[in-house]
Swiss-Prot record:
GO BP: meiotic cell cycle; oogenesis; spermatogenesis
Pfam families: DND1_DSRM, RRM_1
Full protein name: Probable RNA-binding protein 46
SUPFAM superfamilies per the UniProt record, alphabetical: RNA-binding domain, RBD (SSF54928)
Gene Ontology molecular-function annotations: RNA binding
Functional description taken from the UniProt entry: Essential for male and female fertility, playing a crucial role in regulating germ cell development by ensuring the proper progression of meiosis prophase I.
Length: 534
């Protein structure tokens, strides 16, 4: 007991911890028999609990708690969360001042209790006018490895990663969208545990690390979204990967209808992957077993059940530890040892551009505050900001290029005349770092009435092809796992932009927009030097 007290209040003279709080925490330890220690900016209660034998609980037993009042501690929080089940470990993030940082992680002894805690305590009014947010927290066991030679096969990459790191379970390698004999220049390495992944990252990151004579890039990969079994039992949409770029939706529908005609409701194809919607779940399950590994237009496809979106309200971790609505799809938390936690929090997210079935975009948050006379303002570098400080797709794309040490995107403006005689606009985006001297570019297939909207749409379209993939369960439900997905983007750092909002503009007619022809170049805009040309 005395040792526990020493660890728990180690350096307590530096903290403004009230005597009443100390007494309450000591009483909690005495009543429960749990240990409590403070280390690396977090206070750990339990882990393991008294009398525990065997390994820690499996992945999926931990929940994240946000919007905790700063002056609330374990003496109030632990009894509350114990209502859902036996707590294996409670970790409260702490400030140096002694206040908590507004969030915590609670690990239960099984997944059922963790899910019950979410149902019971998400949006729970913990004190008058204060509501906490609770959602699933997942240990990240995957690393992103970039700048891999594109001719290397999965077996070679797996063998090499096992040589240089321990605990490797598998590697995920995607073929190029344009050449199926090559990989995309990156892979995801699966480890047996979060600790194994963290140790591997620590070994690979400090300095330039080479494989096959190439300096590789290493980063945490966004963990795969986990969906509860009850929800997955309702899914009747298949996710089909590794298609040829030239394969059409009609071909895919015909192939999946072959085993039983008329079972496919619709198909949505995006670059080299597609979503196949079935009229019934049993049709989808049967088709998955029959079609997985089959050849379509010479490409061997991978078929899995699409993962639906979590429809509950999402929360976002701010710098002060509080959570707000309208969040990114996934939130990542790194502790001082470089380990990472990812929270599975999907909510309203952007659909495929201008899909008639897409949901309404979220309105941007109100972020204006009064500037009181005498307020001290400090000059800062634009790229020292965090991702949540950017809202527009144009800024996200520029930030994305900066993070990958690429030159900034180049925007080329095109125009055409609509059926009503109105001028319509579209931008073509060129990324010199990945297109080189080729004619490759990114250009949306929709036109806008206003130049600002056209540029924003082009930037989002480019980001989608660099880093987005979509997993709808219907035309109105879509999620965004972070997966680099473009041929020629080897070594791209994983990056998940937030959803964007646009002002309303009239829907454009289906005008053929090509590079040249009847659509003339009107304007070139560079992020570094703007000039006009005829």
């Amino acid at each position: 007991m005395e040792d526990n007290c020493t660890d728990m209040f180690n350096g307590c003279s530096k903290f403004d911890i009230s005597i009443q709080t100390q007494v309450a925490l000591l009483a909690l330890i005495d009543n429960t028999g749990y240990t409590m220690v403070q280390v690396n900016g977090q206070r750990k209660f339990g882990g393991p609990p008294p009398g525990w034998e065997g390994p820690p609980p499996p992945r999926g037993c931990e929940v994240f708690v946000g919007k905790i009042p700063r002056d609330m501690y374990e003496d109030k929080l632990v009894p509350l969360f114990a209502r859902a089940g036996k707590i294996y470990e409670f970790r409260l993030m702490m400030e140096f001042s002694g206040e908590n940082r507004g969030y915590a992680f609670v690990m239960y002894t099984n997944k059922e209790e963790a899910l019950l805690a979410i149902r019971m305590l998400n949006n729970y009014e913990i004190c008058q006018g204060k509501f906490i947010g609770v959602c699933v927290s997942l240990d990240n066991c995957r690393l992103f490895i970039g700048s891999i030679p594109q001719e290397k096969r999965k077996e070679e990459i797996l063998e090499e990663m096992k040589k240089v790191t321990e605990g490797v379970m598998d590697v995920i390698v995607y073929p190029s969208a344009t050449d199926k004999t090559k990989n995309r220049g990156f892979a995801f390495v699966m480890y047996e545990s979060h600790r194994a992944a963290a140790m591997a990252r620590r070994k690979l990151i400090p300095g330039p690390f080479q494989l096959w004579g190439h300096t590789i890039k290493v980063a945490w990969a966004s963990p795969e979204k986990e969906v509860d079994e009850e929800t997955m039992q309702k899914v009747k949409v298949l996710y089909v990967r590794n298609l040829m770029m030239s394969t059409t939706e009609e071909t895919i529908k015909a192939e999946f209808n072959r085993y039983k005609p008329g079972v496919v409701e619709r198909v949505k194809k995006i670059r080299d992957y597609a979503f196949v919607h079935f009229f019934r779940r049993d049709y989808a399950i049967a088709a998955m077993s029959v079609m997985n590994g089959r050849l379509i237009d010479g490409a061997r496809i991978e078929v899995t059940l699409a993962k639906p979106v979590n429809k509950e309200a999402a929360w976002r971790q701010n710098g002060n530890g509080h959570m707000n609505a309208n969040s990114e799809c996934l939130l990542n938390f790194a502790n001082k040892e470089g380990s990472q936690k990812a929270l599975d929090m999907c909510s309203n997210v952007p659909a495929y551009l201008n899909n008639p079935n897409s949901p309404t975009f979220l309105e941007p948050e109100t972020c204006t505050y009064p500037c009181i006379p005498g307020t001290k303002l400090t000059p800062i570098n634009l790229y020292s900001l965090k991702i949540h400080h950017f809202h527009s797709a144009v800024m996200h794309l520029e930030y994305f290029c900066y993070k990958n040490n690429w030159s900034f995107p180049e925007y080329y403006l095109y125009s055409t005349t609509g059926q009503d005689g109105k001028m319509l606009l579209a931008y073509k985006v060129i990324l010199p770092a990945i297109t080189g001297n080729t004619n490759s570019y990114f250009m949306p297939d929709k036109l806008c009435s206003f130049v600002e909207d056209a540029k924003e749409l082009a930037a989002q379209f480019t980001l989608m092809h660099l880093d987005y993939s979509y997993h709808p369960t219907s035309g109105k439900n879509i999620s965004l796992p972070s997966t680099a997905a473009t041929s020629g983007t080897s070594g791209v750092l994983p990056y998940t932009p937030k959803p964007y909002s646009y002002s309303s503009y009239p829907s454009s007619p289906n005008v053929s927009l090509t590079n040249g022809g009847s659509v003339g170049k009107q304007l070139y805009v560079s992020n570094q030097a703007s000039y006009f040309s005829g």
